[in-house]
Amino acid sequence: MVVLLTGLLAATGCTQPGDTRKSEAQTAPSPTTAMRLDKPKRLLDRWPESVDRSLHKTAQQNLGNLKKLLGGEPTSAIGTAYVTWEGEYLPERGWYRPAGGSTVLISGLSGTVSDPRATLNAAFANLTRLTTVAPTAPGPLGGEARCGTGQDKGTHIEACGWADNHTVALVTFIGFPAAQSRADDFRQVRSQLENPVR
């Protein structure tokens, strides 16, 4: 389904001046107040949380690998999945996924992120089924953000991630139409998940 993160990327090499400008265009200041991630009951107020154990297991494994990127212990964490269908209950799976349903995997945490760019490099380093990864606008919360697309067993995947001084997360859209980018949905999801610490 989704390639699991298995290691860190040591970022090396030279860049051209144009590369730097492109990357900087997709970077904005990180929030100055401490942030946390909160799990909504319905994603974007429309998609229910899945109870499919295999989806949750994948999200939790990705979360475990993201924890290695923090400078210390996480202050909050999310590792879950949302679906665009309600589903029919099957005891052996938890839920049955009808044909045409799409899934959103979310793996993210808050804590100390000392270098958001290097952290995001590491988060994307082993997502080998993504054929294109490019910077994207991070939205009003700032930091670094990028999205990549690929295929897994004929299913379209778009993975987007962000890192700022307080949070790092991956949002993976599985089975959505390839013709439409999920970058706007990604920014809306981030705005729903990332909130100031109270």
Q: Language-model features: where?
A:
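A short, solvent-exposed beta-edge/loop patch
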Residues: A145-Q188
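A short acidic-to-branched-hydrophobic micro-motif
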Residues: V83-R117
